[in-house]
Amino acid sequence: MSSKLLTIQLLEELVHAAELNQEGKTADYIPELANVNQELTAIAVQTLGEKTLAYSNNPLHPVTLQSTGKMIPLIGLLEEFGADQLFEWVKVEPSGDDFASITRLEQFGPKPSNPMLNAGAIALCSRIPGVGEQQFRWLEHWVQKLFNQRLSINPLVFASEKRTGNRNRALAYLLKSRNNLGADVHETLDLYFALCSYEAMLDQMLYLPTLLANSGKDSDTGEQILSMETCKITLAIMATCGLYDETGTHMVKTGMPAKSGVSGYTIAVVPGKAGIVVLSPRVNAKGNSIRGEIMLEGLSKAMNWHFALP
């Protein structure tokens, strides 16, 4: 099967094909997320050793990470504590339930099923070393490392998350009642809400998936930023759990490990080849970007980037 050349024209075609789909809507249960332009559709690709290519149908602005930010405590704690310790705090099994499921935690706890669920990310946030400001500095350190620059927290989104985050509070208290929360509920949730409220431009999102595609090495400098072991584990978790109870469908169609967020960002990885980020805030009931998935599937087919292809 021959693959196309990766060009701006191809990315433009992918965006225009995705624009034809009018399904989904912005995630209005976090009020600030409802204010974004729901027609925004964009893609950026960094192939290893090549220049970044990007295309957007509208002017770009910073968008919050939401659940793509769950990669930060996962990778940071893997690097600092190792897999054996991390798997004492959270399992790595696909859940088959929605990202904020309380039933799943109650039935199969006390460990959350995986780090990509809200319960899993909250459990990991409670294990961030230090107290108070030390924990926020830890987050800042790992944001700097995984995005190769500092990111800002959107204060309106942070306030919105805190004001409407009752289900996440319920998850945190349930974890606490099962002795699987390593810190105070309120302090842990502040870290979790901050994590979701970091905001980044499209090109800023591209560093992390490219880092994972390159076995943890900075593609420009060759510096080893993350261990190969951490990259291997992270990609396996993305491939099995990255889009919640739609991960199987995603992997069948694209063959790319990925992580989605309700803001519309999805990052995807083609190991040894490329890092990808797509953006469209029209999300489905499972919290995944509908147009984002259309673009990833089209890109995978055009470039023969499905992991199962020889």
From Swiss-Prot:
Keywords: Hydrolase
Catalysed reactions, semicolon-separated: L-glutamine + H2O = L-glutamate + NH4(+)
Keyword hit for Hydrolase: yes
EC number(s) on file: 3.5.1.2
Superkingdom field: Bacteria
EC class name: hydrolase
GO molecular function: glutaminase activity
Pfam family, one: Glutaminase
InterPro entries assigned to the protein according to its UniProt record, in alphabetical order: Beta-lactam/transpept-like, Glutaminase
Residues the record lists as binding substrate: 67, 118, 161, 168, 192, 244, 262
Family as reported in the entry's similarity comment: Belongs to the glutaminase family.
Protein known as: Glutaminase
Organism of provenance: Legionella pneumophila (strain Lens)
